[in-house]
């Protein structure tokens, strides 16, 4: 088990760290709620059920894939619901998570966070139009904010085959740009993501860029820097990929200014 000093050193060196921080009982509660929402969607919309509604894995995989094929809005409604549930909010604000994030941001224990980009990704195999290309969220989130990002698999260990997050090794130490960097910076603080297949690096200095998929087990999270280049993994199997994301902003930082990225009233 790494000491706090070693955790900080590794985070600064690599730009990310994988830690065991999630209570798996929380994940099971969310999985059960997800299955409930899926089965209710079938009933409420009079859709023929071809999966086993009494089996969680069948429901969240075959059941969700079929819902998406009937109408993407049915998946979208569930996508919008779960991250605002008390179970999910309890998960992203757990003491185990926030204490480590405070450690990495050099904050006091009583510091508070503003969270955004809180979601549970629900990626369907064979569909890539919702996958993000190479980007850093320093260019796309709150201007000048001091924040750390979280990515974690929900119900299956994350591997290259099932869409684990992909990074450019040591990119937090390189001043890299893509063909979309200027556009991202001009739209800073707004919803602004680039298509997976259209983003290319403009490698002016000729650095050798090496990408890596980060394997993550259930119960683990990736915490990474806002200037680490990353992109969505591609699913190469028949199951859904479910992953949680959240950004943790230090609201005590003088440069923090709230920006309404989502146009909520």
Locations of regions flagged by a protein language model:
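Non-heme Fe(II)/2-oxoglutarate
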Residues: 40-52, 60, 64-69, 176-183, ...
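Short, structured patches in soluble enzyme cores that scaffold and shape functional sites
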Residues: 119, 134-136, 152-156, 169
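Non-heme Fe(II)-dependent double-stranded beta-helix
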Residues: 1-13, 20-134, 140
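Short, conserved beta-strand element in jelly-roll/cupin
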Residues: 141-160, 215-218, 247-251
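Glycine-rich, charged/polar anion/phosphate-binding loops
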Residues: 134-138, 151-152, 208-210, 228-230
């Amino acid at each position: 088990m790494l000491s706090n000093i070693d955790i900080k050193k590794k985070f600064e060196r690599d730009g990310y760290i994988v830690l065991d921080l999630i209570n798996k009982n929380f994940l099971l509660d969310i999985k059960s709620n997800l299955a409930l929402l899926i089965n209710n969607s079938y009933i409420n919309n009079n859709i023929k059920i071809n999966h086993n509604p009494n089996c969680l894995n069948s429901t969240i995989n075959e059941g969700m894939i079929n819902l998406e094929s009937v109408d993407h809005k049915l998946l979208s409604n569930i996508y919008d619901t779960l991250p605002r549930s008390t179970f999910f909010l309890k998960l992203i604000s757990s003491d185990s998570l926030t204490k480590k994030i405070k450690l990495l941001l050099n904050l006091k224990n009583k510091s508070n966070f503003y969270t955004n980009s809180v979601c549970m990704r629900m990626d369907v195999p064979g569909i890539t139009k919702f996958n993000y290309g190479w980007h850093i969220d320093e260019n796309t989130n709150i201007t000048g904010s001091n924040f750390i990002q979280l990515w974690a698999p929900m119900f299956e260990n994350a591997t290259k085959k099932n869409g684990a997050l992909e990074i450019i090794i040591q990119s937090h130490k390189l001043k890299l740009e893509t063909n979309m960097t200027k556009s991202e910076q001009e739209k800073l603080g707004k919803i602004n993501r680039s298509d997976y297949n259209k983003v290319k690096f403009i490698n002016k200095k000729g650095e050798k860029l090496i990408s890596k998929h980060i394997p993550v087990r259930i119960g683990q999270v990736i915490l990474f820097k806002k200037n680490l280049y990353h992109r969505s993994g591609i699913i190469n199997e028949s199951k859904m990929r479910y992953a949680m994301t959240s950004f943790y902003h230090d609201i005590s930082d003088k440069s923090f200014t709230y920006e309404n990225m989502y146009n909520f009233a």
